[in-house]
């Protein structure tokens, strides 16, 4: 076992603080409409230009292991916020840095770290409750477009296209983002379906950036039973390999040698393949498989109707223009099914809804109807170069996550104003001792940081703006960093999803609180560098021969 190095007490806090400072300083320059870009070097290809906080955070590794631990913990804040809300990663990083910096000052002054953490937690609970009170529902297309615009770094064209996509396929509808072929963004609504089943093995992934399996113009095999014996599949796989097209297998389950063979074929490039479990259970699974069959122009291979897997031919398979399979769901885009058949199937489901007496059955049938009739909106991102395309695509995906979060939990005034407005709720927080009161004050000071950083990135004096916003009576009053004007943030279209602000605050307080209460850090001792001339030892032996000469 390798030797370890330990640090204790204030040494720990200082080391973590240095690491957090490096990471947060790199991330926070991107905050707000006038935030700057960060260029990330890649081991191959062109560098990536981004204004996305989590993308910057993920690239940072520090040489000093103690400092790196601090940086990695704040990286976790950004990643968790991105996973939970899809946006707000820079805000979360700024909040975490602020809580840690203020917290370390208090700990070094002799206060109890555990009580400080309890005070911070109480303040965050009160602030989140107040955030929910000032939140407004986000229902109309205009508000959705505004949220998308803000999240896409004030790019109105992105906000508008997301709002249009949501209007066409519904707020719960499936929206995917693809590379476009022109300079402008384009929206296309195609026949499609998404269901909540992901790939059966991570070895099917072929897009490492999105961690997804993407198949262009694939065959789709639908099987209403478990597949475990590979012999049943071999004749069909051989025919598909000859055609050169990829394959998506949807079955009750795929296990054992059948799954292993599909994985091996995929890795070797014999057949590009992905396998997923069929959605639903029992009779509902059979019905959903039939829906997919109608959508893709295929047949469900089922012994109930006299079709066996060994005898299946390419004519029994469905197909689609594109299929995207992630860890959690599968999206079939532009299936090759006959429009008349799809229409008849939709009518059949509508009749079933009318005749059903069970609310649960009606809800499930309604879901099937939405999947079959709703279609999939595809946003095609246009750009002049590949570097711009990557950056723009990331912004569209961020904006899409933010608008979904806004629809889910509503919106609050943006630009860091919401966190300023909830500060008054901290006045009534009950504390047990002076150290907890200081914890509440740490959270209070930290919540003003995002507004100050947004203003700082515009080059204006942050203290003046923060004071003016804080002392104004109107909840929505704030500073528009893009234009330099004061006014009603909601009317100016500067909105943040409540979920994004809430998640950023909770995650930042959670990790920063843990860091403040850390008393010891343990890491591996750095390996000693070997001497530059390993042959030197042998040369030393030659001197001994000289001694022997003296004996003669």
Curated annotation (Swiss-Prot):
Belongs to the chaperonin (HSP60) family. Its main location: cytoplasm. Forms a cylinder of 14 subunits composed of two heptameric rings stacked back-to-back. Interacts with the co-chaperonin GroES. Its EC number is 5.6.1.7. Coiled coil: none annotated. Together with its co-chaperonin GroES, plays an essential role in assisting protein folding. The GroEL-GroES system forms a nano-cage that allows encapsulation of the non-native substrate proteins and provides a physical environment optimized to promote and accelerate protein folding. It holds the Pfam family Cpn60_TCP1. It is found in: Cytoplasm. This is Chaperonin GroEL. It catalyses: ATP + H2O + a folded polypeptide = ADP + phosphate + an unfolded polypeptide. GO terms for cellular component: cytoplasm. PROSITE patterns: CHAPERONINS_CPN60. The keyword Repeat does not apply. One of its GO terms (molecular function) is ATP binding. Disulfide bonds: none annotated. Gene3D superfamilies: GroEL (3.50.7.10), GroEL-like equatorial domain (1.10.560.10), TCP-1-like chaperonin intermediate domain (3.30.260.10). InterPro entries: Chaperonin_Cpn60_CS, Cpn60/GroEL, Cpn60/GroEL/TCP-1, GroEL-like_apical_dom_sf, GROEL-like_equatorial_sf, TCP-1-like_intermed_sf. It is an enzyme of class 5 (isomerase). Keywords: ATP-binding, Chaperone, Cytoplasm, Isomerase, Nucleotide-binding. ATP binds at residues 30-33, 51, 87-91, 415, 480-482, 496. One of its GO terms (biological process) is protein refolding.
């Amino acid at each position: 076992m390798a030797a370890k190095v330990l640090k204790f007490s204030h040494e720990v806090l200082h080391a973590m603080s240095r690491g957090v400072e490096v990471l947060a300083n790199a991330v926070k320059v991107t905050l707000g409409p006038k935030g700057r870009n960060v260029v990330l070097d890649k081991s191959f290809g062109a560098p990536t230009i981004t204004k996305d906080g989590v993308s910057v955070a993920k690239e940072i590794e520090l040489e000093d292991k103690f400092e790196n631990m601090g940086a990695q913990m704040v990286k976790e804040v950004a990643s968790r916020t991105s996973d939970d809300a899809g946006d707000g990663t820079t805000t979360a990083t700024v909040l975490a840095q602020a809580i840690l910096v203020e917290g370390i000052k208090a700990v070094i002054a002799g206060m109890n770290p555990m009580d400080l953490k309890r005070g911070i937690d109480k303040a965050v609970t009160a602030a989140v409750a107040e955030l929910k009170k000032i939140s407004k529902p986000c229902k109309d297309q205009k508000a959705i477009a505004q949220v998308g615009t803000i999240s896409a770094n004030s790019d109105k064209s992105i906000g508008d296209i997301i709002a249009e996509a949501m209007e066409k396929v519904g707020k719960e509808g499936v929206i995917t983002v693809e590379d476009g072929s022109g300079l402008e963004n384009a929206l296309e609504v195609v026949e499609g379906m998404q269901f909540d089943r992901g790939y059966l093995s991570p070895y099917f992934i072929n897009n490492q950036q999105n961690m997804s399996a993407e198949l262009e113009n694939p065959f789709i095999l639908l099987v209403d039973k478990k597949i475990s014996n590979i012999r049943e599949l071999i004749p069909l796989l051989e025919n598909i390999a000859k055609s050169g097209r990829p394959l998506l297998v949807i079955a009750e389950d795929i296990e054992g040698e059948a799954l292993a063979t599909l994985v091996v074929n995929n890795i070797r490039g014999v057949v590009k393949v992905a396998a997923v479990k069929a959605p639903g259970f029992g009779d509902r699974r059979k019905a959903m498989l039939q829906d997919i069959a109608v959508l893709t122009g295929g047949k469900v291979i089922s012994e109930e109707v006299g079709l066996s897997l060994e005898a299946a031919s390419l004519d029994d398979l469905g197909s689609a223009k594109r299929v995207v399979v992630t860890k959690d769901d599968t999206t079939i885009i532009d299936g090759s099914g006959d429009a008349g058949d799809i229409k008849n199937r939709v009518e059949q489901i509508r009749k079933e809804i009318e005749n059903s007496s069970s609310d649960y059955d009606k809800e499930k049938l309604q879901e099937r109807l939405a999947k079959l009739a709703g279609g999939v909106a595809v946003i095609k991102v246009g750009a002049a170069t590949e570097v711009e395309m990557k950056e723009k695509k990331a912004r569209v995906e961020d904006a899409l996550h933010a608008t979904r979060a806004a629809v889910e939990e509503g919106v609050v005034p943006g630009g860091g104003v919401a966190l300023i407005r909830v500060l008054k709720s901290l006045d009534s927080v009950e504390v047990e001792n002076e150290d907890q009161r200081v914890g509440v004050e740490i959270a209070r000071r930290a919540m003003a940081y995002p507004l100050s950083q947004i203003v700082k990135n515009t080059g204006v004096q942050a203290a003046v703006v923060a004071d003016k916003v804080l002392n104004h009576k109107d909840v929505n009053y704030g500073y528009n960093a893009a234009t330099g004007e004061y006014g009603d943030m909601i009317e100016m279209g500067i909105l943040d999803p409540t979920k994004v602000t809430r998640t950023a605050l909770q995650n930042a307080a959670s990790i920063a609180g843990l860091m403040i209460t850390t008393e010891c850090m343990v890491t591996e001792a750095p390996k000693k560098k070997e001497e530059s001339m390993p042959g030197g030892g042998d040369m030393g032996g030659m001197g001994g021969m000289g001694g022997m000469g003296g004996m003669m």
